[in-house]
Amino acid sequence: MNTKFLLSSDNNNRNELLKKKIIHYYIANGDATIADLGREMDLSIPTVTKLVAELQDDGYILDFGKQETNGGRKPNIYGLNPASGYFVGVDMLKDKLNIAAIDFKGDKVQLEENIPYQLENTPASLEQFCKIIDDFIVSLPVEQNKILAIGVNITGRVNPASGYSYSIFYFEEKPLAQILEERLQTKVFIENDSRAMTYGEYMKGVVQGEKNILFVNMAWGLGLGIIIDGNLYYGKSGFSGEFGHFCMFENEVLCHCGKKGCLETEASGSAFHRILIERYREGSNTILAGKLDSGEEISLGDLLEAVRKEDVLCIDILEKMGVNLGKGIAGLMNIFNPELVILGGTLSLAGEYISLPIKSAIRKYSLNLVNQDTEIKISN
């Protein structure tokens, strides 16, 4: 099976580029006839027929037989062969990993969530990361040589084109993607976590035809994914979307980026954690008092569970964070005039406790015409 054209970034070979576009069409739209493809791609029927035949020979496309029609000659319908290849996706969080495998049509084959893992910028943490992925691949009910690629979502500054990560695992001179490929013996692509989540929503989530989208990733940190005219926006070096580092506050809180006053210092999971400790020390009460007194680690999950149990302190902190986030998002909306803003990430699981103050602040601080143009949804 020819896999080189799928993983190549060379767009000079027209034949291979068109094959990739055909596969992308099937991923986005499902099964289709030769005529459908020709119409959508503005190609002649003979050209499409030739390309589809080559993809059939390579095992990527299947002929599903005649399509039912009301009359005339019945055309054959074609679609992706789910068993022609598999992909593994890895979601890297502060204290756990989520790993999934999908087939060539994008259907889930296997999912493992909340795998314990401590993210640190050390060779030992990187080795543990690779070991967990190795173990997952071995457990799959497919041949390992059928794994075409591994996608890794990484927080912070990532350049997918060069394969470099500048926020985590940057202790070697080689690109992180290359290091992972050598260790895992499979093609690896790295991507910023917020952008990856944005694309996931665009392909399989709450997006319903919108082409100009902002995805706000509210987790331990704060990130942003941007889609303009149906395409992910990267910026010059792949560093777009650092929403959490808007300078919005005159505080003395040092952000992990090394600067003070970042939005992330007052409106993120890490801010939630810090403010809870500060307020508790000042005398406020919380159902997390036992953990705070014992010095036990408090996770984002613990904070959200306290909110669900109607902990007054945690709800108050979250509401204030929502207002700050809403102000920032209102500014983004005034700049980008998006059709859709998606609220996602772990903090979005707080539901209306965070979404209502965000929406209220957006209405207050965004331009009315822009606000009326934009729909706000919670990620599913």
What are these regions (language model features)?
Residues F87-D91, I147-G151, I213-N217, G223-G225:
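Short glycine-aspartate micro-motif
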